Structures are given as structure tokens and as C-alpha cells.
Amino acid sequence: MSTVWYDAEFIGQKVEVAGTNRFWFKLKSDSPVAYKPGQFFVFDLPSGEKRADRWRSYSIANIYDGSNILELCITYEKGGVASQYLFNDINKGDVVKCKGPEG
């Protein structure tokens, strides 16, 4: 089965506790993207030139409801380029690529 890449629009974030935020992304797809508990998506973030700097895997934190909205719960990693982007640089409406679900 081939991997499908989606555009994911950043729609918001909320501080859960100090250093951990919830993030919401809306997958742009003509049909619902189904996933199961325990699965994850790989995000290609604009945080470097090499794939190892850009690709991050995040477990899905919400139950599938057909809305194509992914909720992620992410802990800030000091010095982490992906953390810098997600916690400080991303803006509502920004679009990143992601693939999945996997796992």
C-alpha cells in the first residue's frame, strides 16, 4: 500500500501543562481519513534541510470522528528544532505535510 501525504492546516494550540501543548491540524482531504487508537502520523516540518531534522512522528490524541481533525499532545524539547517550530513559529492557517496513519 502506498503512503498518502496530506496537507495539514494548523488550526490552533492550547497549553495543557507547562511545557506540554495540545495542537490541532485539519487534514485537507475530500474524504475522511480513518485511524485507530495507537496510530500516528509523520509530519514533515519546515525545521531543516535533512529529513532527520524535518520528519517527526506524533501519536494521535483524539478519537476518530470523521472530521479530519488531528489532535496531538506534544512536550517541548529544549533545543529541539521541531519544538521551536511548533511552540513558537507556527501560525494559524500554516500548512505542513503529513502522512499516515501508520502503526
Predicted regions and their residues:
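Ferredoxin-reductase
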Residues: 2-94
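A short, basic/flexible loop-to-alpha-helix module at the beginning of a structural domain
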Residues: 87, 100-103
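Structural and coupling elements of P-loop NTPases
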Residues: 96-98
